[in-house]
């Protein structure tokens, strides 16, 4: 087995990371408040849409499923699924599910450890189903610190511009975003994206304040 580092997309979040790992010619962040990413004009939101994109790109020889569904299959069913597809994407969501919620975000490291155990079980099941090549990827990373977040952890500036479409603690999507000393602005072309949605990311590892 080999472990290789790779640079992810910016901004580093689920929708863009998952879309970038699909076959694509053009990635566009949707011009609305959803943060959804379009792959060659199609929404990549959800496993069903991602499976459709995979199937179209491979003449029906690729699909997507989730960890829980595959692990619930018996050996014959899992073998048939692999036999019907040259490529199979299997999504595992424990880390995101834990880390994205305020009441459980402190358990992110524990979730990462449990995920490693899940992946070992998954690899064994895939090997028993005659899978020949297995690649494990991550669609984005996360910032974790084992202490309470302090005032100094937040950026002292707030994103502003003609239109703020989507806010996250680590980035903002919008149009006509105004330059700021505490934020780094990227045009879509600088990030390998199409469309006209711009991105701002706090400098260093500072967070942005969210209302509510």
Language-model region placement:
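Feature captures the catalytic ectodomains and active-site-proximal regions of enzymes
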Residues: 1-212
């Amino acid at each position: 087995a080999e472990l290789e580092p790779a640079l992810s997309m910016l901004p580093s979040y689920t929708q863009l990371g998952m879309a970038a790992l699909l076959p694509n010619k053009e990635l566009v962040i949707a011009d609305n408040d959803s943060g959804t990413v379009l792959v060659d004009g199609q929404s990549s939101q959800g496993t069903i849409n991602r499976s459709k994109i995979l199937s179209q790109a491979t003449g029906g020889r690729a699909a997507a499923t989730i960890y829980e569904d595959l692990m619930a299959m018996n050996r014959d069913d899992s073998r048939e699924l692999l036999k019907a597809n040259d490529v199979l994407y299997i999504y595992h969501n424990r880390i995101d599910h834990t880390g994205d919620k305020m009441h459980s975000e402190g358990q992110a490291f524990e979730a990462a450890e449990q995920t490693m155990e899940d992946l070992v079980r998954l690899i064994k099941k895939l090997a028993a189903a005659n899978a020949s090549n297995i690649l494990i990827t991550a669609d984005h990373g996360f910032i974790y610190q084992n202490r309470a977040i302090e005032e100094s952890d937040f950026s002292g500036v707030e994103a502003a511009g003609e239109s703020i479409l989507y806010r996250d603690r680590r980035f903002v999507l919008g149009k006509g975003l105004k330059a700021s000393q505490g934020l780094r602005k990227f045009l879509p072309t600088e990030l390998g994206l199409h469309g006209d949605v711009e991105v701002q990311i706090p400098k260093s590892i500072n967070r942005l304040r969210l209302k509510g």
